[in-house]
């Protein structure tokens, strides 16, 4: 799953404290749905997803994006037990929603992009490396039920 050094943990926690969960969550999920349109099939109940502007302005996309990043906050508090932290969500996404686990990796990569946009120069290569390790670990934990 990847071992987090104390430096990784400090880097992730420090940046996370500055993240606006609502804004970053909505933008991350919105970008996922625009850039990877096949992911939209999991969000039929969200209404109008017909264009980039419709998706980015959709209140249900924003609300679910906030929910996703809120659960990521739980992961950040439990970096040494990502699998345990996401056991129930893994089961839900695998058994009930049948989400392709590759989508977790895509979402993590989109989040890293959004953080880079929001934090600019502060999002150094070292910060990116720690965050990439974290989103990869989260994707792996969410995919654990599939194995």
Swiss-Prot record:
Q: Quick check: keyword Nucleotidyltransferase in the entry?
A: no
Q: Which Pfam families match?
A: Globin
Instruction: Name the InterPro entries for this protein.
Output: Globin, Globin-like_sf, Globin/Proto, Hemoglobin_b, Hemoglobin_oxygen_transport
* CDD domains membership: Hb-beta-like (cd08925)
Record's SUPFAM superfamilies?
Answer: Globin-like
Q: Which UniProt keywords apply?
A: Acetylation, Heme, Iron, Metal-binding, Oxygen transport, Phosphoprotein, S-nitrosylation, Transport
Phosphothreonine PTM positions:
13
The Gene Ontology terms for molecular function here are: haptoglobin binding; heme binding; hemoglobin alpha binding; metal ion binding; organic acid binding; oxygen binding; oxygen carrier activity; peroxidase activity
Q: Which residues carry this modification: S-nitrosocysteine?
A: 94
Q: Does the keyword Ligase apply?
A: no
Tissue specificity annotation: Red blood cells.
Ranges of residues in domain Globin:
3-147
PROSITE patterns, per this entry? Answer: GLOBIN (PS01033)
Positions of post-translational N6-acetyllysine modification? 60, 83
For binding heme b, which residues are annotated in this chain's numbering? 64, 93
Provide one Gene Ontology biological process annotation: hydrogen peroxide catabolic process
Q: Which domain of life is it from?
A: Eukaryota
Subunit description: Heterotetramer of two alpha chains and two gamma chains in fetal hemoglobin (Hb F).
Q: Which family does it belong to?
A: Belongs to the globin family.
- Function of the molecule: Gamma chains make up the fetal hemoglobin F, in combination with alpha chains.
Q: What is this protein called?
A: Hemoglobin subunit gamma-1
